[in-house]
C-alpha cells in the first residue's frame, strides 16, 4: 500500500439544528433519508460525535482524502433539511506538537533556547 493510500484526514462537521423543527421532525427526516445507515459512509470512521446544546451536533470523522466527496454527498442527501452544515478539514497535530516540544526542550538544555521572534 502506498503512503498516500494510508493517509487520512480529519473532517469536523457542524450539524446545526434547524430550530424551526422539533426533535421528532428532525428524527423523522433522518429516518426517512436513511441517515443512520448511510452516515458515515463505509471507509470513514467516527473519531468523535458530540451534542452541543443549543447548536446541534459536532461530528469528527477520520477518512482517506478520496472519500471527502462521498461524505459531502451523504450530508446533502440525508442531513440537509434539518441541519445547516459547516465543514472543517483538519489534521492530527499531536505528533507535530510532541516533536516541537522535544526540540524546544533539547535547545533549552543546550542553552541555546528556542528561537525567539524578532520585535
Per-region residue spans from a language model:
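A short linear hydrophobic-aromatic micro-motif
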Residues: 42-49, 84
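Short, compact, well-ordered microdomains
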Residues: 66, 71-77, 82
Amino acid at each position: 500500500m502506498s503512503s498516500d493510500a494510508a493517509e487520512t484526514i480529519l473532517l469536523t462537521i457542524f450539524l446545526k439544528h434547524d430550530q424551526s423543527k422539533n426533535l421528532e421532525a428532525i428524527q423523522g427526516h433522518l429516518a426517512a433519508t436513511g441517515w443512520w445507515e448511510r452516515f458515515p459512509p463505509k471507509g470513514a470512521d467516527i473519531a468523535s460525535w458530540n451534542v452541543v446544546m443549543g447548536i446541534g451536533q459536532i461530528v469528527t470523522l477520520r477518512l482517506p482524502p478520496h472519500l471527502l466527496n462521498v461524505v459531502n454527498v451523504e450530508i446533502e442527501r440525508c442531513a440537509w433539511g434539518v441541519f445547516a452544515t459547516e465543514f472543517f478539514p483538519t489534521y492530527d497535530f499531536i505528533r507535530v506538537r510532541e516533536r516541537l516540544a522535544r526540540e524546544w526542550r533539547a535547545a533549552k538544555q543546550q542553552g541555546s533556547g528556542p528561537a525567539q521572534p524578532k520585535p
